[in-house]
Amino acid sequence: MIIYKYGKIMHVNTNYLILDHNGEGDLIYAPNISRFKKDELRKIFISQIENEYTKVTYGFDNFKELVIFEDLIEIQGLGPKTAISILNIGWENVINYVATANKGALGKIPYVSSKIANAIIFSYQDKYAKFMKKLTSDEAAKIKVPASSENENKFLDTMKMLGFKQQQIKFALDKIELNDDIETCVENAIKLISQQQHETSRV
């Protein structure tokens, strides 16, 4: 089994490159194609998918990205093209979304249905949670926290600091729409909680 090829990149297109390896030109499809530069000498990790009709080579920047690709295509209904689409967001983000069961973020990726997002999380959440703990500082720095998650974390921290209970915070969070104006969100949440307490006391 060939794990990687080393050679000179002769051409880069929107979703594939041509690698000159031992005098042969290999056409390789790759995620985040902008990472690969024409005339660059480099190692490319590969996965070859072969059936009775075609043989297609997919290429990756590093071994970890290759492993995640191989994991993804094990999911029923998830083919190589969808796996490449998923990896276009960065393999570091993929394992983060799966480890944290962020179905919403996965579902926003082209060609990823709710069913597929659930299947990925079900199959690999535990594995990728362990994977997350072993990331280097450079790899961890590439993880993008969705704005909504960041806002939610700020909101939760503020509400807890103000002394509200988890149940009260959840009640407010279900009712309001979070945005970058955390102060206003907190004010609205306090009003909702106060109204709820007032209504409860009247019963």
From Swiss-Prot:
Gene Ontology, cellular component aspect: cytoplasm; Holliday junction resolvase complex
Gene that encodes it: ruvA
Protein name, as recorded: Holliday junction branch migration complex subunit RuvA
GO molecular function list: ATP binding; four-way junction DNA binding; four-way junction helicase activity
Record carries keyword DNA damage: yes
Region (Domain II), start-end ranges: 62-139
Organism from which the protein derives: Metamycoplasma arthritidis (strain 158L3-1)
UniProt note: domains: Has three domains with a flexible linker between the domains II and III and assumes an 'L' shape. Domain III is highly mobile and contacts RuvB.
Presence of keyword Glycosyltransferase: no
